[in-house]
Design a protein with these regions (language model features):
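Interfacial juxtamembrane loops and adjacent helix segments
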Residues: 46-123
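Juxtamembrane segments of multi-pass membrane glycosylation machinery
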Residues: 125, 131-150
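Membrane-interface micro-motifs in multi-pass membrane enzymes
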Residues: 127-128, 180-214, 218-221, 235-241
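Transmembrane-helix motifs of polytopic, lipid-linked glycan transferases
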Residues: 151-175
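Perimembrane helix-loop-helix junctions
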Residues: 207-209, 244-271
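Membrane-interface alpha helices of multi-pass inner-membrane proteins
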Residues: 222-249, 267-280
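Membrane-lumen/periplasm interface segments of specific transmembrane helices
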Residues: 268-341
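Conserved small/polar residues in nucleotide/adenosyl-binding loops
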Residues: 343-349
Length: 353
């Protein structure tokens, strides 16, 4: 696999060092900035405005995972060093056996760091690479302002992709990329710390392809490109919809490069394998590093988590349960989305064949 092993090893080492560095940042200002807007960001019940849009927004917002991310950013145990924090990812919660992140974050802020009535949890099986930007941002801005900033970044990236695609005379790439966004509940992605990660990575990957496709293709560097995209997804994403960072760039590749059907099929398989090696390899690297250095038991925990998540869904076999969930998701979209679906299927398929 050429340079894959070296790229993975370097990525794991650099990723670990960067996490250690951000855990050296002072958390006091971060906590104060979170306290300023925690009430606005975690509204419940009568606190939610009465208008229909606000109700839709607050009903569907990913506050559960957003609250975990924010609290991970402001946690600091006085008897633990930066490396231990980066590997263990300590997290206080009001409950011992279940997670209540929204209530726990509110309590954490209101108690001014008094955690006597809270339970210490760990979340070691993920990299939590989002802390590389979330911690510095919370050092400077409130939680609400960070969300607005991410919203602006996403809009700017979408405009950049659109302009670049038009200039490169590849409007189909823009159509596939931005059209896909309609399937992601766009408003909710735009205002969610959790759900925006994979979308931002996807936009950056597509933009890089538009700018450097000729070089990547001529030098045969697309396998490494998809490897790196998989690595970045594994590092930054909090297990939301990671496959998007593979699927959309793949569609864009076949719009940018025409070849015989058999060659395209081989490339499809090869690029998927590259992305998968990057994604799984980077994730496994976290387990190995944490287990070897701190005996965290992360590998055992991860294996049991995988087993638990491949069991039946609602009494259905895993495969049938998966299709059932997809069906429920499709009910969330209006009828006109069928037109967008047809466009997304025909454009890449025509290029592939």
């Amino acid at each position: 696999m050429r340079n894959f092993a070296a790229v993975l090893a370097i990525s794991a080492v650099v990723g670990t060092m960067l996490l250690i560095l951000v855990f050296l940042l002072p958390v006091g200002p971060m906590r104060r900035n979170v306290e300023k807007s925690v009430g606005d960001m975690l509204k419940t019940g009568d606190e939610i405005p009465e208008d229909a849009f606000s109700k839709y927004l607050w009903k569907n917002r990913e506050t559960y995972t957003d609250a975990i991310m924010v609290q991970n950013a402001i946690e600091r145990l006085p008897d633990k060093n930066a490396y231990e924090h980066a590997m263990w990812m300590y997290h206080y919660d009001l409950e011992e056996d279940v997670w209540t992140p929204e209530d726990s974050l509110k309590a954490f802020c209101e108690s001014h760091e008094n955690v006597n009535n809270m339970y210490l949890h760990i979340y070691a099986r993920y990299w939590h690479g989002y802390l590389l930007y979330l911690k510095p941002l919370l050092l400077l801005f409130s939680w609400k302002h960070v969300v607005w900033l991410e919203l602006a970044v996403q809009i700017a990236l979408m405009i950049w992709v659109l302009i670049t695609a038009i200039r490169k005379q590849n409007a189909g790439v823009a159509a596939v990329t931005l059209g896909s966004f309609l399937f992601m509940k766009p408003v909710l992605v735009l205002i969610s710390l959790t759900m925006s990660v994979c979308w931002i990575l996807t936009l950056l990957a597509v933009e890089y392809m538009l700018l450097h496709h000729d070089r990547l293709h001529e030098k045969g560097q697309y396998p490494e490109f998809f490897l790196i995209v998989g690595i970045l997804t594994s590092y930054f994403d909090f297990l939301t919809y990671p496959i998007t960072t593979l699927g959309i760039p793949l569609c864009c590749y076949f719009l940018l490069e025409n070849d015989r059907a058999w060659n395209n099929i081989k490339k499809l398989i090869g690029f998927c394998a590259s992305w998968g090696i990057g994604y799984a390899g980077m994730w496994a690297a976290k387990w190995v590093i944490a287990d070897l250095t701190l005996h965290t038991g992360t590998i055992k925990d991860a294996i049991w988590s995988i087993i638990g998540r491949t069991e039946a869904i609602g009494g259905r076999p895993r495969m049938n349960g998966g299709f059932y969930v997809i069906g429920l998701n499709l009910h969330e979209y209006p009828v006109y989305m069928g037109t967008v679906s047809y466009t997304h299927l025909t454009l890449p398929t025509n290029s592939l064949l």
